[in-house]
Amino acid sequence: HLNSVMNDKEIRAQYEKSLNLLTSHYGKIGQNKKLFSQYEKLYEQNRKNLTQSQNKLLENVLRGFRLSGVHLNVKKRKLFRECQEKLAKLESKFEQNILDSSNSWAKNFKTIENLKGMPQSSLEIAEETAAKRNEVGYTLTLDQPCYMAVMTFADSQSLRKTMYLAYASRASNKFPISCKWDNTKIIENILLLRQEMSQILGYKNYAEYSLATKMAKSTNEVIDFLESLKIKAISKSKKEMSVLKNFAKKHYNLKTISPWDIAYIAEKYKEENFGISQEE
């Protein structure tokens, strides 16, 4: 958490160092056969006398050992740990690229003219941001509070579009500042490592491996649930979008609603019909 909210070179270096140590440490614990056998012994000898919650706790611990590869031979255990460590580094780099690309983007306005509709609290933060950057006026960033305030309240469709496209393309080859933080290759490598780790443990794919700790019993069960949910969600969302489109056409002369318009129009609709505001 600290690495995300107070990120600098020193904290990042310590975070990377600690991440490597922790990943290695927990990987070795998860594959400690002696420790596993003690937990297994504790469970087998006492499960009849333990409460349901206590048994469940021990079962989860034992499952964690198995999902760490405790049952594998020496060669496969070593390979699995190597994959874990590589994966941890890639996931960390993935997050850093998003953070770095987000921090690289900012838009300054000398006056409040283009920021009409924005709440006073958001304008004050934008003013403080500008001052910290030795800029005059108001500076917007891709930080979540600032981004959501613009998408929800800014009257300028052009500003909302600019912010939306920048935010949606962070850490990609479409990012307007630079593509040096592009996560495409990292995502591909993460998927390959997850697949390799899953197969080492005897699963067909990462989805099956992931379900080992979840209530759903199979990938088909998950897909069926999502398909069922999709049907209900699409039906409901089409009705809601129809309402918003009619409202936008009537009050803002918008023939179509773009992704960067949805939060704004929805907010105006709530204010108009229910007398409530997200800011309040």
Annotated model-derived regions:
Residues 9-19, 182, 225-228, 249:
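Membrane-interfacial loop-to-helix junctions in multi-pass inner-membrane proteins
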